[in-house]
């Protein structure tokens, strides 16, 4: 086993602290950070979907991208590059989002939910690991979305520039955006505090290469578990924080913004894990890479935003359990998750060396 990378551990611990702190400051329970949920909220705020309870310009997303961008510029790691199957990456990003919203959370929120005692997230983790395992099998056999290329500075600057523009608009003309009056979208920390925390997290994630998918993938492929230590650090810090705040609740029922539709929790996160391996990283990692100038990751993020809009406009997202209803994933969402798995399989086969694709078939 390789030595512990303490930068990854420290970054994971700080992400965990940030998640607990943001919840204390107003973010929904077990949702101090969630890339899928926050991109979904931004899509709603920008009127891309009409779900009134999940609409808010989340400064955490802006901060993650800009924190990564600033750190990459300081360290000389900012590079404008792209051109690696952008349309395919857009589609993968959309289906990763659909899978995440069936489960009600990205891989980062899955870990945060585990730290809060939500055992539904354990089911999600099983599906997530299975999805990564499947993706790794294709990767080992030569799956590739082909190389990227050095591009004009403007290409790599698109997502950071969009985030700066979004921040300026939400400060100067907040009436342009929808903002939830109830539900998860109405629960948020102070914008400037959340932005500051996310800038720090984005910078640390850039330096440490923190990735929820990468730790499991690298462990399976190379026996290298150093990124997994960040995953564990987030869990332990969130667990300790919840115990200290008396907000830890072990079980399946009564969990915040969650449901116990186990088959679809598992399959939703299987789709997320598999799709993320093909993209080269989890949704958090895609944001960080986009901040570094990676246009392909920016396309994946835009695909996620489009996927969030589709999920809520067409009833694909899971419904959280309440005292009155069990919640879960409806028929439309189930069809979308199965379709997503089929699409990801087709993409996996289509981007393997021809002899390997023939064997897999």
Indicate where each model-derived feature is located.
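Membrane-interfacial helix-loop segments of redox and metal-homeostasis proteins
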Residues: 1-361
């Amino acid at each position: 086993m390789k030595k512990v990378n303490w930068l990854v551990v420290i970054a994971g611990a700080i992400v965990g602290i940030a998640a607990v702190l943001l919840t204390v400051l107003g973010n929904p329970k077990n949702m101090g950070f969630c890339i899928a949920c926050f991109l979904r909220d931004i899509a709603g705020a920008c009127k891309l979907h009409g779900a009134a309870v999940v609409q808010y310009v989340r400064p955490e997303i802006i901060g993650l991208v800009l924190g990564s961008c600033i750190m990459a510029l300081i360290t000389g790691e900012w590079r404008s590059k792209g051109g690696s199957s952008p349309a395919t990456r857009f589609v993968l990003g959309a289906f990763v989002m659909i899978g995440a919203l069936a489960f009600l959370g990205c891989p980062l929120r899955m870990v945060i939910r585990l730290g809060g005692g939500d055992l539904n997230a354990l089911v999600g983790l099983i599906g997530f690991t299975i999805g990564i395992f499947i993706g790794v099998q294709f990767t080992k056999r030569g799956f590739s979305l082909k190389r990227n290329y050095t591009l004009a500075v403007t290409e790599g600057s698109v997502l950071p520039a969009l985030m700066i523009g979004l921040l300026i608009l939400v400060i100067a003309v907040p009436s342009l955006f929808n903002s939830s009056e109830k539900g998860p979208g109405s629960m948020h920390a102070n914008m400037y505090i959340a932005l500051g925390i996310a800038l720090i997290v984005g910078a640390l994630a850039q330096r440490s290469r923190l990735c929820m998918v990468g730790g499991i993938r690298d462990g399976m492929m190379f026996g290298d578990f150093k990124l997994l230590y960040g995953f564990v650090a987030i869990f332990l810090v969130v667990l300790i924080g919840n115990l200290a705040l008396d907000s830890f609740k072990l079980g399946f029922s009564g969990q915040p913004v969650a449901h116990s539709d186990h088959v679809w929790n598992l399959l939703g996160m299987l789709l997320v894990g598999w799709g993320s391996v093909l993209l080269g990283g989890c949704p958090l990692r895609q944001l960080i890479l986009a901040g570094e100038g990676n246009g392909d990751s920016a396309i994946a993020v835009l695909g996620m935003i489009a996927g969030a809009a589709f999920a809520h406009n067409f009833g694909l997202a899971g419904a959280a359990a309440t005292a009155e209803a069990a919640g879960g994933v409806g028929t439309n969402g189930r069809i979308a998750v199965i379709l997503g798995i089929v699409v990801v399989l087709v993409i996996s086969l289509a981007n393997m060396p021809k002899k390997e694709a023939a064997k897999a078939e």
